[in-house]
UniProtKB/Swiss-Prot annotation:
Residues 224-387 form the TrmE-type G domain. It is an enzyme of class 3 (hydrolase). Mg(2+) binds at residues 238, 259. Its cofactor is K(+). Homodimer. Heterotetramer of two MnmE and two MnmG subunits. It comes from Helicobacter pylori (strain HPAG1). Pfam families: MMR_HSR1 (PF01926), MnmE_helical (PF12631), TrmE_N (PF10396). The lineage of its organism: Bacteria, Pseudomonadati, Campylobacterota, Epsilonproteobacteria, Campylobacterales. This is tRNA modification GTPase MnmE.
Length: 461
């Protein structure tokens, strides 16, 4: 689409326009316009002059005198809008072609095509939202975890900002007190002051660590727990994977070495995302490709969170089984020992198997011919390894920049506490901690850094 804006300079003073709804057909599409010329563009599109702010109107939409659609239009007068500027929304029928034509009409009338995240950038620069609220709005769009929605909604409401600002205010009071006492000799500094400051710093550090720990745990949950399924060929790994997926995802065959590479699928278990990794059967092989698959299987044990070690209960322990046991011991990960094929006569020496395992483990017997009966037990054993997160009334850090800033603030507060006897150093580290807190909600980034941050947003946002 050609942008016919008379100015090629991309400035925050431009009137911008974009389609705010996802691509594809739907009931409606929304075109947003923001800037000093937004209302004038809407008047020309509708051939109407009277628009009361925050009232919805059904209006015909024209382009060069040609009727395009009958749409719902709303005018938000500055500063009472998302961006803080005049904003107009056009809600048309959900044809992608129609939305593109209306957008082009906006561009023909002087708007510029918005860059990704530019509406949010305007809101940020016009002090309609702080950085923590902007981050929350993006994560809310991307969120796939119901337990996180409440924390994001609270952050969007501004509760993280309030938490940070209250902490910042308390630290500023400590800084002011320490600056007053710098000119005093050490023996003139009240001992009660040092004790109170130390107590307050410990309390602040603990609250920051709680926020950081919860955010890190939630990030791991969002990423998903990696669960590797390992065993010798024909132990029943692929059958177990298929049963857990309730579909034929992995090829099940009596021919050894059928699975030559890792197969990865994602399921949800007890509210947690789990990445199931079916690995190549571990055995000695002259086949170069199969050996590469086996090496990849052993490597997956180093990077996973939980291991399902699958053993054939109907056969005595073999050299390949002991190779797997050694791999489990080296990985030092939580392990569920799955004794498969319990519908056949047991020949596996269970006590020998137990004596060779040097890691925490639990045991589950399964029958791949009727494995659904034990899937519930398997799910409970797997979920027992998941951390129990209390998401009620919790705040959440949603970006690496936020986590880094808080980690730096914690480090500086600890440094300040360690230098309580030297108030100049104490004040220096305390000020550094405050500056790191500032970057969570009121960053001092350059224009280029802001452009980079907001470019990650979607168009129309």
């Amino acid at each position: 689409m050609k942008n016919t804006s008379s100015s090629t300079t991309l400035t925050m003073n431009d009137t911008i326009a974009a389609i705010a709804t996802p691509s594809g057909k739907g009931a409606i599409s929304i075109i947003k316009i923001s800037g000093h010329n937004a209302l004038n563009i809407l008047k020309q599109l509708t051939k109407k002059q009277d628009f009361t702010p925050r009232y919805a109107y059904v209006r015909d939409i024209f382009s060069d005198g040609v009727l395009l659609d009958k749409a719902l239009v709303i005018y938000f007068k500055a500063p009472y809008s998302f961006t803080g500027e005049d904003v107009c929304e056009i809600q048309c029928h959900g044809s992608p072609l129609l939305a593109q034509n209306i957008l082009q009409a906006c561009l023909n009338l002087g708007a510029r095509l918005a860059k990704a995240g530019e509406f949010s950038k305007k809101a940020f620069l016009n002090h309609k939202m702080d950085l923590s609220e902007i981050e929350a709005s993006v994560q809310l769009i991307l969120c796939e975890d119901e337990s996180v929605l409440n924390a994001l909604a609270r952050q969007l409401k501004g509760e993280l900002k309030i938490f940070i600002e209250e902490a910042r205010s308390d630290l500023l009071k400590l800084l002011a007190s320490s600056e007053v006492l710098i000119d005093y000799s050490e023996e003139d500094i009240p001992s009660d002051f040092l004790k109170e400051v130390s107590f307050n710093l410990e309390k602040q550090i603990a609250s920051f660590k709680d926020l950081l720990d919860f955010s890190n745990a939630q990030k791991q949950k969002n990423k998903g727990h990696a669960l590797s399924i390992v065993g010798k060929p024909n132990a029943g790994k692929s059958s177990l994977l298929n049963a857990m997926l309730l579909e034929e995802r992995a090829l099940v065959s009596d021919i050894k070495g059928t699975t030559r590479d890792t197969i990865e699928e994602v399921i949800e278990l007890k509210g947690h995302k789990v990445r199931l990794i079916d690995t190549a059967g571990i055995r000695e092989s002259a086949d170069k490709i199969e050996r590469l698959g086996i090496e990849k299987s052993l490597k997956s044990l180093e990077n996973c969170d939980i291991i399902l070690g699958v053993f054939d209960l109907s056969k005595p322990l073999e050299k390949e089984d002991f190779t797997i046991i050694d791999a489990l011991n080296r990985a030092k990960k939580p392990c569920i020992v799955v004794l498969n094929k319990n519908d056949l006569a047991p020949k596996l020496e269970l006590e020998i198997l137990k004596s060779h395992l040097k890691i925490p483990y639990s045991i589950l017997e399964t029958n791949t011919l009727n494995s659904k009966a034990c899937l519930k037990d398997l799910g409970q054993k797997i979920s027992a390894f998941f951390p129990k997160l209390d998401t009620q009334n919790k705040l959440l850090l949603t970006s690496l920049a936020q986590k880094t800033a808080l980690e730096n603030a914690i480090t500086e507060l600890q440094n300040a506490k360690n230098h309580l006897e030297t108030l100049e150093l104490f004040s220096y580290h305390l000020l550094s901690a405050i500056e790191n807190l500032n970057s969570l909600t009121r960053p001092y980034e350059t224009s280029q850094m802001l452009d980079s941050m907001f470019s990650e947003f979607c168009l129309g946002k």
